[in-house]
Amino acid sequence: MRKETLIGLAFITANVIAWSLRWRMQKSTTIAAIAGCSGAATFGGLAGGIVGCIAAGILAILQGFEVNWHNGGGGDRSNPVKRSSDSFSIVNHNGEKVDSYAHLVPGKVGKVIIDNIELSAIRYANNHTSLGYHFTSDGSGPAARGEATTIWGVGADEAIDKGTPSKNDLQNMSADLAKNGFKGHQGVACSTVKDGNKDVYMIKFSLAGGSNDPGGSPCSDD
């Protein structure tokens, strides 16, 4: 296995361990992003830097999912619960803060802010929500959409009503993504969190420069 790949996976493993031990201070994901993007790029070159950024993006997205599940306000609920955490917020395309993914205007690009890390957010007509973590093609840090490679996490909003994944489920999902890597023409990794025999949430990460619709990525719903 190439040196930069090993370094990138080491950053992912470190992030997963830190997350599972609840080393989740206000600036934890910012530190992870700095370590993943600059550290891996320094020691592992281009590929290592990109994989390190992916690690930070996965960590931030998973933390956001946990906050969403545990504090409510997801899906199509008529009375969404306001979040108590100052480290998590959802902002519509016009800059207005909203209480739920369900309040995002379909097709418009809003954002989710988790511990000062911004993720782009799009709600589709089928009520699926995509979260994107943008970083430059050289892995040096966040970038504008036009010059960024994007990681997308995809899942159905209504899944929040089917059960709450455990922390172990989320940790296993991140580990599964790290283990399997990014495959296929667009570099796709998929994982499903399950509650008993029911599929609760499928997350799909796709490296696709300039893409803002991950729906065509080859992930199975099984």
From Swiss-Prot:
Asked if the keyword Signal belongs to this entry, the reply reads yes
Identify the stretch annotated as signal peptide in this record: 1-18
Which InterPro entries does this UniProt record tie to the protein? Killer_tox_Kp4/SMK, Killer_tox_SMK_b, Killer_tox_SMK_b_sf, SMK1_alpha_su, SMK_a
- CDD domains (alphabetical): Killer_toxin_alpha (cd12838), Killer_toxin_beta (cd12839)
Instruction: List the GO terms this entry assigns under cellular component, sorted alphabetically.
Output: extracellular region; protein-containing complex
**Record keywords: Disulfide bond included?**
yes
Gene3D superfamilies per the UniProt record, alphabetical: Smk Toxin, alpha chain (4.10.420.10), Smk Toxin, beta chain (3.30.44.10)
Q: List the disulfide bonds.
A: 37-53, 190-219
What are the annotated glycosylation sites?
127
Keywords, A to Z?
Answer: Cleavage on pair of basic residues, Disulfide bond, Glycoprotein, Signal, Toxin
GO molecular function terms attached to this record: toxin activity; toxin sequestering activity
**Ranges in a coiled coil:** none
Q: Which GO terms describe its biological process?
A: killing of cells of another organism
Q: Which domain of life is it from?
A: Eukaryota
Question: What this chain does, per the record?
Answer: This toxin kills sensitive strains of yeast.
Q: How does it assemble?
A: Heterodimer of an alpha and a beta chain. The fate of the gamma chain is unknown.
**Additional notes on this entry:** The full activity of this toxin depends on NaCl or KCL. Its maximum activity is found at 2M salt solution.
From the Swiss-Prot or TrEMBL record, give the protein name.
Answer: Salt-mediated killer protoxin 1
Q: Species name for this entry?
A: Millerozyma farinosa (Yeast)
Ranked from the top, the taxonomy reads: Eukaryota, Fungi, Dikarya, Ascomycota, Saccharomycotina
Q: Which gene encodes it?
A: SMK1
